[in-house]
Amino acid sequence: MPKESYVAGIDVGSTTVKLVIMNAQHETIFARYERHYSDVKAASARVLKEAMTELDPQTVVQCTITGSGGIGLAHLLQLKFIQEVIACTKTVETLIPETDVAIELGGEDAKITFFGASLEQRMNGSCAGGTGAFIDQMATLLKTDANV
C-alpha cells in the first residue's frame, strides 16, 4: 500500500523560519516556528531535521519554499520557490476561501490582499519596513509574548 503523501511549506523570513506539513485533507501534521537570529542555514536545518524525525522515512513530501530568505535555500535544496505574496494568496484561497481580506506582517514589510471579484494586493514602502520586528520590540517593552 502506498504511503500517504504530504505537502510542506517553508517560509524563511528576515527573522524566522516557519515549516508546516499537511496531509491531503489539509490537516497539519507538523508545524514549527523558530527565530533564526541571522543563522538561516542552521535554523532551517534544525527545523527540517525535527520534521524528518516525525515522519515515516518512506513518506513523500512535496515541498515549496517562500520568504525573503527562501530563494537561497530553495536553490541549495533544489526545491520550488514561490514569491511570498503569491504563496499567501494561494493558501488563503485554498484553506479559507470565504476570506475578504488578509494582512500579513513580516519582519521587513506588511502586505494586504483584498479578495473578491478582482484580486488587489498592496505592500508597504521601505519607510514602514520592520513591522514584525516592531511588534517583537513592543512585546518586549510591554513584557508580553508576541507569539500568543
Spans of features found by a protein language model:
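Short glycine-aspartate micro-motif
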Residues: 7-11, 62-64, 98-104
